[in-house]
Regions:
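N-terminal intrinsically disordered, cationic/polar leader segments
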Residues: 2-138
């Protein structure tokens, strides 16, 4: 392959892609739900993490919306859980999916949705959404 046709790469590796996913996060505690069929929206407007390649901070808004089944998320432990991401090198897409998995593990909701709305980096902003139950292959507009 000539230099002219050489494919450019960003330098991201599989290690970058998996960065942060082996972190031991603190548990998210719960408390017994007393009602049925309502939604809870938890909003973290100052969510921060770190790019695993550059080490630069990422800023955004993280929202967790869910319908509780038997338990609700305890907010102080959730805050401590989210603080774990502050100095953690992890991709934005992985943050949203990891938070969703940990919320589901903690409280087994009827359904849940986590949205990460990250501020622009190089002129491009990112919004990542993950839902439970997972609906793989479903067209989403």
């Amino acid at each position: 392959m000539s230099k002219k046709n050489k494919k450019k790469t960003t330098g991201y590796t599989d290690d970058h892609a998996a960065a942060g996913l082996d972190t031991k996060f603190p548990p998210i505690e719960t408390w017994r739900n007393q009602f049925k069929a309502y939604e809870i929206l938890v909003d973290d407007p100052e969510f921060t993490s770190v790019c695993p390649k550059t080490g630069l901070p990422d800023f955004g808004r993280l929202t967790i919306r869910y319908m509780p089944r038997e338990t609700c998320l305890e907010l102080k432990s959730l805050k401590e859980y989210l603080f774990t991401y502050r100095n953690l090198g992890i991709f934005q897409e992985n943050i949203v999916n990891q938070v969703l998995d940990d919320v589901v593990k903690a409280c087994n909701p009827v359904w849940a949705k986590v949205v990460g709305d990250f501020r622009p980096r190089g002129g491009i902003s990112t919004i990542v959404e993950a839902t439970y139950p997972r609906q793989i292959g479903r067209a989403h507009v």
